[in-house]
Amino acid sequence: MFLIFIIIISLSGPAHGQSAEFHGSATVQFLETMQHSQHIKLIQPLHFTDSGGDTWTTEANQVIPLNLLTDEIRLTRPLPSPFEYLKTMILFHGQVEGGRSDWRRTQAIIYEALIAEGMQEHWAKMIYAAVRAEGWRWEPLESSCFAMCHASSPSLRWRPLPDYEQLRHTLDWILVEFPSLPEIDERVEALITHTGPHIFGQ
């Protein structure tokens, strides 16, 4: 079975007075095949400028999964639909697939990307916390570690394993207490039980 349809999503300027913003329009092709169930293909490049002035680009023709969070979170907490933060999802997975940026910096811009996309702050902080806890991490392709140890591999990426009960409590805490991002980072760091298989890229 093969299903494709195309949608164009307008990307607005800064939201809520933030300097971070998406540029242009996102044109994506929805895929439903045996190989790529619930995936999208980016037809045109997507650009995002963060609050520090750096521009992040997701190149055209990348095939991207239509989710940012695992079922452990999506099915147990009433978070916004992925379609409400589609551009942020494209941004993050584009960096994962590209494998050239630092995963720490990529995760750090998720919150401001969500805000730039129009997400309410409490939802943005909850999604940000989940990405910090269980989101993809990777060794950059151009790093010395990759060149010395993993040159024969097309990529090296992994997900950390959080204590999901504590993560769900943390999402509830964010909704009630509205903590700062540093407070969220500290709490999330404490609930990760396994950072991953890679000795250098934790």
Regions found by a protein language model. Give the residues of each.
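Bacterial N-terminal signal peptides
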Residues: 2-10
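Extended terminal accessory/targeting regions
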Residues: 17-202
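N-terminal signal peptide c-region/cleavage motif recognized by signal peptidases
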Residues: 12-14
